[in-house]
Amino acid sequence: MIRAIVFDLDNTLTDFMKMKEAAIRGAIDAMIDAGFALPREQLRERVRTIYDERGLEFQNVFDELLEREFGEVDPKILAAGIVGYRRARESELVLYPHAQLVLLELLKRGIRLGVVSDAPRLQVWMRLCALGLQHVFDAVVTFDDTGERKPAAAPFREVLRRLDVGPHEAIMIGDWAERDVVGGKSLGMTTVFARYGDTFDTKVSGADHDIDDLLELIGIIDRIHGASPGSAKPTEG
């Protein structure tokens, strides 16, 4: 009996990489307009280099960019970059198709919902609030809550504890096989690979099920509960 579903957030419920790229483009255009005299592609490469070094959640990327280029922070260019980034981010931060429908159906069935993310706590909650999901989840576990990243057991154990369910009563769904699938499986959770959000061209996920649309999750639950097979696609091989 499945009593809880645990979601990864980025590239599982929302297309994080699409949003990030759009936000970076918005920031670059705004900084150039404010007087940053570098070609657009060159500026984009410098921003990507900082993210590669510091991680995609690094919050002072434009400060560091300006310090590297000019030895100091130009407040006008910095402000333009931040505003441009936020405007583009807000317009591009949307749920994947059928995500809202699936979440509502799960709530209607009385299934408890959780999130496990490697992102910092504030960033996770900002994204959930922007998506209108701040009241949907019974448990939200971020990197700050355990100090460990997936596939370590701690984040998964913590979300199961907060949801008050055992691992065999929960499904873990995520787009990163080496983290979401491996971590969930290690505790005995049923695992679902969100192939639609995969950015690594994963050939074999190792999950119990691969899906190309969130709507297929309902079919998986129905099959586990002995109802109809729905549209679930078991992992091949």
Question: How would you describe each model-predicted region?
Answer:
Residues 1-5, 17-18, 68, 78, ...:
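Asp-based, Mg2+/Mn2+-dependent phosphohydrolase catalytic module
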